């Protein structure tokens, strides 16, 4: 289905950077953890979609953060400097906050 559920093919030569897989831990506001195995060059939209589907929540209502910075759909783990066992935090979008009297 997606790179989050596949295993390395083993065809990597000496330089494995682009085909390298890392494990990422996605932690929700309720401290639930879901682990993903992704390629360094996979767009993180796939991970976000998979997480949202597993949680039964629409992706647009969630915010994904890595080291305090919001993750966009076209980011890759390689671009963000992610390493094996890094953590992505997920927060429910909050709107409003202004109260009219």
Curated annotation (Swiss-Prot):
SUPFAM superfamilies: Ubiquitin-like
Processing and modification events after translation: Cleavage of precursor form by a sentrin-specific protease is necessary for function.
Compartments in which it is found: Nucleus membrane; Nucleus speckle; Cytoplasm; Nucleus, PML body
GO biological process, one term: protein sumoylation
Recorded GO CC terms: cytoplasm; nuclear membrane; nuclear speck; plasma membrane; PML body
Domain of life: Eukaryota
Function as written in the Swiss-Prot or TrEMBL entry: Ubiquitin-like protein that can be covalently attached to proteins as a monomer or a lysine-linked polymer. Covalent attachment via an isopeptide bond to its substrates requires prior activation by the E1 complex sae1-sae2 and linkage to the E2 enzyme ube2i. This post-translational modification on lysine residues of proteins plays a crucial role in a number of cellular processes such as nuclear transport, DNA replication and repair, mitosis and signal transduction.
Protein name (database record): Small ubiquitin-related modifier 1
